Swiss-Prot record:
GO terms for biological process: proteolysis. The gene is pepA. PANTHER family: CYTOSOL AMINOPEPTIDASE, LEUCINE AMINOPEPTIDASE-RELATED. Mn(2+) 2 binds at K260, D265, D284, E345. Presumably involved in the processing and regular turnover of intracellular proteins. Catalyzes the removal of unsubstituted N-terminal amino acids from various peptides. It comes from the Bacteria. Belongs to the peptidase M17 family. Keywords: Aminopeptidase, Cytoplasm, Hydrolase, Manganese, Metal-binding, Protease. One of its GO terms (molecular function) is manganese ion binding. InterPro entries: Leucine_aapep/pepB, Macro_dom-like, Peptidase_M17_C, Peptidase_M17_leu_NH2_pept, Peptidase_M17_N. This is Probable cytosol aminopeptidase. Mn(2+) 1 binds at D265, D343, E345. Gene3D superfamilies: Leucine Aminopeptidase, subunit E, domain 1 (3.40.220.10), Zn peptidases (3.40.630.10).
Length: 491
């Protein structure tokens, strides 16, 4: 599928289907829209009336045009109120148009959406993202991968003729999101710690990064008892992945992104019970998947920022070697942990990963993890929790997320809640009381950071979509690759 920006007015465009964005107050035919309606013998006005189209955000309508017309179909998509228009408005409108074009088996599509803040490049980029992400369908495991194959061949973004670079960048960004989606979608018999590490090596080779894989013996030498405690029950070897992107000149900043990478989590000896969706625990590496997706994009966009991408990859399984509830582990910073729940394993793997990241002497560390069900209870499926020791860093991430159209809500690091993690026989337990579970999880991770500005993203809700939602189809969403990339590019 070829996506391009052109300066052709929608009045002069020809092709299979012309898609128009309409505001709530714009359903009265005037100006150029009136001219188009006249050219199409009243088709637009007729569609508005018959579909009772009011321009509300997310609504859409389509109709055929007479056989002598230079276009075959007209599509309308609602934009909501004009004063509420944002980049994400056109991004999601473009996604709705793309899905409709697929349903209608359109081959050539013209899209006319309003330019946001007089910035044609950013608008074209958002439109391209919307198209690519809404149309992504993961058919790799179907016997006929071409079933319901896309017919769309060419998309023209009208009124954005100088946007080639922005569209190319959107395609690069979307490829990282799609990589993360497909990693999350992959079952645990295809994505293992070994194949996850191989994916990281492939990214390094194709995107200009370096890749270091620490094997179990290397991790033992570094004292990673917390990570290895989780890993020892699995028959598959753990892989500690360290990807590095360095710019050609002196970097403006040095950053670290750390992703939780449990390729499968059965809960360990605290086995997940019925109703705990054990079959969905292939997605417990969603943080690592987004980390690799961001690494792929950053390597191709080549910002003047040094970035370290870290994933401690393993499974949490059951065997005679498994950690027991009550065991004590020693992390690589010397702190001891009483394991009172083997199903709170992600934070144990992240503990050593955070210590490793801080030793790189970076300016900021961001970790992301499908860490707690408590965060889903608090914020639902579409919003990630954000905790940070540094408000400047938190504000940077929130700004990056707003540009991406991904949602975060800053949560408190309530130090008093650490009382619930105290152990009589170790420095801390790995879980606290049920109340405030996402906060105590963040406080646990904080024990493995000394002075570096740090943020924790609990992405347990938004990493997976149970139904079509915005630009997401059912399955992995690739959240929050776009936020991470925007954050890195902001320096």
């Amino acid at each position: 599928m070829d996506i391009r920006g052109i300066n052709t007015p929608f009045l002069d465009w020809t092709g299979d289907a012309l898609a128009l964005g309409i505001f709530e107050e714009g359903t009265q035919i005037t100006g150029e829209l009136s001219q188009l309606d006249g050219k199409l013998t009243g088709t637009v006005q007729e569609l508005i009336q018959e579909a009772e189209f009011e321009g509300k955000a997310g609504t859409k309508a389509v109709t055929r045009v007479g056989s002598n017309s230079p276009i075959r179909k007209v599509m309308l998509v609602g934009l909501g109120k004009a004063e509420d228009l944002q980049l994400n408005s056109v991004r999601e409108a473009a996604g709705a148009i793309a899905r409709l074009a697929k349903l209608e088996k359109v081959k050539t599509l013209g899209i006319n959406l309003p330019v946001v803040n007089n910035d044609g490049a950013k608008t074209a980029s958002a439109i391209a993202e919307g198209i690519l992400l809404a149309l992504h369908q993961d058919n790799r495991f179907k016997s006929d991968p071409q079933e319901n194959a896309l017919k769309l061949e060419n998309v023209d973004i009208l009124g954005c003729g100088e946007a080639t670079e922005a569209i190319n960048r959107a395609q690069t960004l979307s490829s990282g999101v799609i990589l993360a989606r497909e990693l999350v979608n992959s079952p645990a018999n295809t994505i293992t710690p070994v194949t996850f590490a191989e994916t990281a090596q492939e990214i390094a080779q194709t995107s200009g990064l370096t890749c270091e894989i620490l094997e179990q013996e290397d991790c033992e030498k570094l004292g990673m008892g917390s990570f290895l405690g989780v890993a020892k029950a699995s028959d598959l070897p753990p892989k500690f992945i360290h990807l590095t992107y360095k710019p050609s000149g002196t970097p403006k900043k040095k950053l670290a992104i750390v992703g939780k990478s449990l390729t499968f989590d059965c809960g360990g000896l605290n086995l997940k019970v019925a109703g705990a969706s054990i079959e969905m625990m292939k997605m417990d590496m969603g943080g690592g998947a987004a980390t690799l997706g961001a690494a792929k994009v950053i390597g191709q966009l080549k910002p003047d920022v040094e970035v370290h991408f870290i994933c401690a990859a393993t499974e949490n399984m059951i065997s005679g070697r498994a950690i027991h509830p009550g065991d004590i582990l020693t992390a690589s910073n010397g702190k001891t942990i009483e394991v009172n729940n083997t199903d709170a394993e992600g934070r144990l793997t992240l503990a050593d990963a955070l210590v490793f990241a801080e030793k790189l002497e970076v300016d900021a560390i961001v970790d992301l993890a499908t860490l707690t069900g408590a965060c889903i209870i608090a914020l639902g499926d579409n919003i990630s929790g954000l905790w940070s020791t540094d408000q400047t860093l938190a504000d940077q991430l929130k700004a990056a997320a707003e540009t991406a159209g991904e949602k975060f809500w800053q949560m408190p690091l309530e130090e008093k809640y650490f009382e619930g993690l105290k152990s009589p026989i170790a420095d801390m337990k790995n879980t606290g009381p049920r109340a405030g579970g996402s906060i105590t999880a963040a406080l646990f991770l904080k024990q493995f950071i000394k002075d570096t500005p740090w943020a924790h993203l609990d992405i347990a809700g938004p990493v997976w979509a149970e139904k079509e939602n915005g630009l997401n189809n059912v399955g992995g969403t690739g959240f929050p690759v776009r936020t991470l990339v925007n954050w890195v590019l902001s320096f």
